[in-house]
UniProtKB/Swiss-Prot annotation:
Entry keyword set: Endoplasmic reticulum, Hydrolase, Membrane, Protease, Signal-anchor, Transmembrane, Transmembrane helix
Record EC number: 3.4.21.89
Species of provenance: Aspergillus oryzae (strain ATCC 42149 / RIB 40) (Yellow koji mold)
Membrane topology: Single-pass type II membrane protein
Family according to the record: Belongs to the peptidase S26B family.
Protein name from the UniProt record: Signal peptidase complex catalytic subunit sec11
Positions on the Lumenal side per record topology: 40-191
CDD domains on file: Peptidase_S24_S26 (cd06462)
Spans annotated as C-terminal short (CTS) helix: 177-188
PANTHER family, per database record: SIGNAL PEPTIDASE COMPLEX CATALYTIC SUBUNIT SEC11 (PTHR10806:SF6)
Location of the protein in the cell: Endoplasmic reticulum membrane
Enzyme class: hydrolase
Length: 191
Protein backbone atom coordinates (compact mmCIF):
# COMPACT_ATOMS: atom_id res chain seq x y z
CA UNK A 1 0.00 0.00 0.00
CA UNK A 2 2.83 2.35 0.87
CA UNK A 3 4.57 1.66 -2.45
CA UNK A 4 1.31 2.47 -4.30
CA UNK A 5 1.11 5.89 -2.60
CA UNK A 6 4.76 6.69 -3.23
CA UNK A 7 4.44 5.80 -6.94
CA UNK A 8 1.32 8.00 -7.26
CA UNK A 9 3.08 10.90 -5.52
CA UNK A 10 6.02 10.41 -7.86
CA UNK A 11 3.67 10.54 -10.88
CA UNK A 12 1.99 13.69 -9.57
CA UNK A 13 5.37 15.35 -9.00
CA UNK A 14 6.55 14.32 -12.43
CA UNK A 15 3.37 15.63 -14.07
CA UNK A 16 3.64 18.88 -12.13
CA UNK A 17 7.29 19.24 -13.20
CA UNK A 18 6.27 18.76 -16.86
CA UNK A 19 3.54 21.38 -16.59
CA UNK A 20 5.98 23.81 -14.96
CA UNK A 21 8.59 23.14 -17.67
CA UNK A 22 5.99 23.86 -20.34
CA UNK A 23 4.98 27.09 -18.55
CA UNK A 24 8.67 28.06 -18.32
CA UNK A 25 9.12 27.59 -22.07
CA UNK A 26 6.03 29.70 -22.83
CA UNK A 27 6.99 32.48 -20.41
CA UNK A 28 10.57 32.56 -21.74
CA UNK A 29 9.31 32.93 -25.32
CA UNK A 30 6.92 35.70 -24.23
CA UNK A 31 9.65 37.58 -22.36
CA UNK A 32 12.04 37.30 -25.32
CA UNK A 33 9.32 38.71 -27.62
CA UNK A 34 8.62 41.60 -25.23
CA UNK A 35 12.35 42.27 -24.82
CA UNK A 36 12.76 42.40 -28.59
CA UNK A 37 9.76 44.76 -28.77
CA UNK A 38 11.37 47.13 -26.26
CA UNK A 39 14.77 46.93 -27.99
CA UNK A 40 13.34 47.73 -31.44
CA UNK A 41 10.65 50.15 -30.17
CA UNK A 42 8.14 48.22 -32.26
CA UNK A 43 4.96 46.53 -31.09
CA UNK A 44 5.65 43.79 -33.61
CA UNK A 45 9.40 43.48 -34.28
CA UNK A 46 8.99 40.48 -36.61
CA UNK A 47 6.30 40.23 -39.31
CA UNK A 48 5.51 37.95 -42.24
CA UNK A 49 4.77 39.23 -45.76
CA UNK A 50 1.19 38.12 -46.46
CA UNK A 51 0.73 39.23 -50.08
CA UNK A 52 2.66 39.70 -53.30
CA UNK A 53 2.34 43.50 -53.34
CA UNK A 54 6.06 44.01 -52.64
CA UNK A 55 7.43 41.61 -55.26
CA UNK A 56 10.19 41.41 -56.39
CA UNK A 57 11.69 42.96 -53.22
CA UNK A 58 9.85 40.58 -50.87
CA UNK A 59 7.89 37.43 -51.62
CA UNK A 60 4.86 36.09 -49.80
CA UNK A 61 6.10 34.24 -46.71
CA UNK A 62 9.30 36.24 -46.14
CA UNK A 63 10.05 36.98 -42.48
CA UNK A 64 10.87 40.67 -41.89
CA UNK A 65 12.78 42.21 -38.98
CA UNK A 66 11.66 45.72 -38.02
CA UNK A 67 13.28 48.71 -36.33
CA UNK A 68 11.26 51.70 -35.14
CA UNK A 69 13.82 53.99 -33.51
CA UNK A 70 14.43 56.28 -36.50
CA UNK A 71 12.80 59.70 -36.05
CA UNK A 72 11.92 60.01 -39.73
CA UNK A 73 11.20 57.80 -42.71
CA UNK A 74 12.93 58.47 -46.01
CA UNK A 75 11.49 58.12 -49.50
CA UNK A 76 12.35 54.62 -50.71
CA UNK A 77 12.37 53.12 -47.22
CA UNK A 78 10.19 50.03 -46.73
CA UNK A 79 7.87 50.35 -43.75
CA UNK A 80 5.23 48.21 -42.09
CA UNK A 81 2.04 49.96 -41.04
CA UNK A 82 -1.32 49.11 -39.53
CA UNK A 83 -4.50 50.59 -40.95
CA UNK A 84 -6.66 52.11 -38.21
CA UNK A 85 -9.43 49.70 -37.26
CA UNK A 86 -7.71 46.68 -38.83
CA UNK A 87 -5.11 44.37 -37.36
CA UNK A 88 -3.27 43.26 -40.51
CA UNK A 89 0.20 44.76 -41.03
CA UNK A 90 0.94 46.03 -44.55
CA UNK A 91 4.49 46.12 -45.96
CA UNK A 92 5.00 48.91 -48.53
CA UNK A 93 7.56 51.47 -49.67
CA UNK A 94 7.46 55.18 -48.78
CA UNK A 95 6.96 57.15 -52.02
CA UNK A 96 6.44 60.64 -50.56
CA UNK A 97 6.93 62.44 -47.26
CA UNK A 98 5.16 65.52 -45.95
CA UNK A 99 5.62 67.78 -42.94
CA UNK A 100 2.95 67.50 -40.28
CA UNK A 101 0.09 69.94 -40.84
CA UNK A 102 -1.96 71.66 -38.16
CA UNK A 103 -5.01 72.75 -40.14
CA UNK A 104 -6.82 71.88 -43.34
CA UNK A 105 -6.16 75.35 -44.83
CA UNK A 106 -2.37 75.01 -44.59
CA UNK A 107 -0.89 73.72 -47.84
CA UNK A 108 1.30 70.64 -47.53
CA UNK A 109 4.58 70.72 -49.44
CA UNK A 110 6.91 67.84 -50.06
CA UNK A 111 10.07 68.21 -48.01
CA UNK A 112 13.61 67.42 -48.99
CA UNK A 113 15.99 65.11 -47.15
CA UNK A 114 17.95 68.10 -45.77
CA UNK A 115 14.86 69.83 -44.38
CA UNK A 116 14.89 70.47 -40.61
CA UNK A 117 11.11 69.90 -40.44
CA UNK A 118 10.35 66.31 -39.40
CA UNK A 119 8.54 64.37 -42.11
CA UNK A 120 5.85 62.74 -40.01
CA UNK A 121 3.33 62.20 -42.82
CA UNK A 122 3.99 59.43 -45.35
CA UNK A 123 2.46 58.16 -48.56
CA UNK A 124 3.19 54.51 -49.35
CA UNK A 125 2.83 52.15 -52.30
CA UNK A 126 3.51 48.48 -52.93
CA UNK A 127 6.27 47.86 -55.50
CA UNK A 128 3.95 45.51 -57.42
CA UNK A 129 0.93 47.85 -57.23
CA UNK A 130 -0.17 50.39 -59.85
CA UNK A 131 -1.48 53.07 -57.47
CA UNK A 132 -0.50 54.43 -54.07
CA UNK A 133 -2.09 53.20 -50.82
CA UNK A 134 -4.62 55.99 -50.18
CA UNK A 135 -7.44 53.49 -50.88
CA UNK A 136 -6.03 51.16 -48.20
CA UNK A 137 -5.86 53.82 -45.49
CA UNK A 138 -8.70 54.40 -43.04
CA UNK A 139 -11.68 56.45 -44.19
CA UNK A 140 -10.74 60.13 -44.49
CA UNK A 141 -7.02 59.42 -44.14
CA UNK A 142 -4.83 60.64 -47.03
CA UNK A 143 -1.44 59.71 -45.57
CA UNK A 144 0.12 57.81 -42.67
CA UNK A 145 1.32 59.40 -39.47
CA UNK A 146 4.88 58.22 -38.72
CA UNK A 147 4.29 58.05 -34.96
CA UNK A 148 0.78 56.57 -34.91
CA UNK A 149 0.51 54.24 -37.92
CA UNK A 150 4.02 52.91 -38.58
CA UNK A 151 4.97 49.65 -36.85
CA UNK A 152 8.57 49.82 -38.03
CA UNK A 153 11.03 50.01 -40.90
CA UNK A 154 12.38 46.83 -42.47
CA UNK A 155 16.02 46.23 -41.51
CA UNK A 156 16.43 42.59 -42.56
CA UNK A 157 14.61 39.51 -43.76
CA UNK A 158 14.77 35.74 -44.10
CA UNK A 159 13.13 34.39 -47.27
CA UNK A 160 10.18 31.95 -47.03
CA UNK A 161 10.58 31.19 -43.28
CA UNK A 162 7.28 32.86 -42.46
CA UNK A 163 5.31 30.62 -44.79
CA UNK A 164 4.60 28.36 -41.80
CA UNK A 165 2.60 31.22 -40.26
CA UNK A 166 0.59 31.63 -43.46
CA UNK A 167 -0.19 27.90 -43.56
CA UNK A 168 -1.29 27.92 -39.91
CA UNK A 169 -3.66 30.84 -40.51
CA UNK A 170 -5.08 29.44 -43.75
CA UNK A 171 -5.57 25.92 -42.34
CA UNK A 172 -6.77 26.20 -38.70
CA UNK A 173 -6.91 22.41 -38.30
CA UNK A 174 -3.13 22.32 -38.84
CA UNK A 175 -2.64 24.67 -35.88
CA UNK A 176 -4.80 22.42 -33.67
CA UNK A 177 -2.91 19.32 -34.79
CA UNK A 178 0.50 20.90 -34.09
CA UNK A 179 -0.57 22.13 -30.65
CA UNK A 180 -1.90 18.65 -29.86
CA UNK A 181 1.37 17.02 -30.93
CA UNK A 182 3.41 19.51 -28.88
CA UNK A 183 1.23 18.94 -25.82
CA UNK A 184 1.52 15.18 -26.22
CA UNK A 185 5.30 15.41 -26.51
CA UNK A 186 5.49 17.47 -23.30
CA UNK A 187 3.31 14.99 -21.42
CA UNK A 188 5.25 11.94 -22.65
CA UNK A 189 8.66 13.45 -21.99
CA UNK A 190 10.63 11.62 -19.30
CA UNK A 191 13.69 13.02 -17.61
Amino acid sequence: MLSFLSSNLSNVRQSLAQVLNFALVLSTAFMMWKGLSVFTASSSPVVVVLSGSMEPAFQRGDLLFLWNRSPRAEVGEIVVYNVRGKDIPIVHRVVRTFPEIEGKTKKVKEISESSPIPNNMLLTKGDNNVADDVELYARGQDYLNREEDIVGSVRGYIPMVGYVTILLSEYPWLKTALLGIMGLMVMLQRE
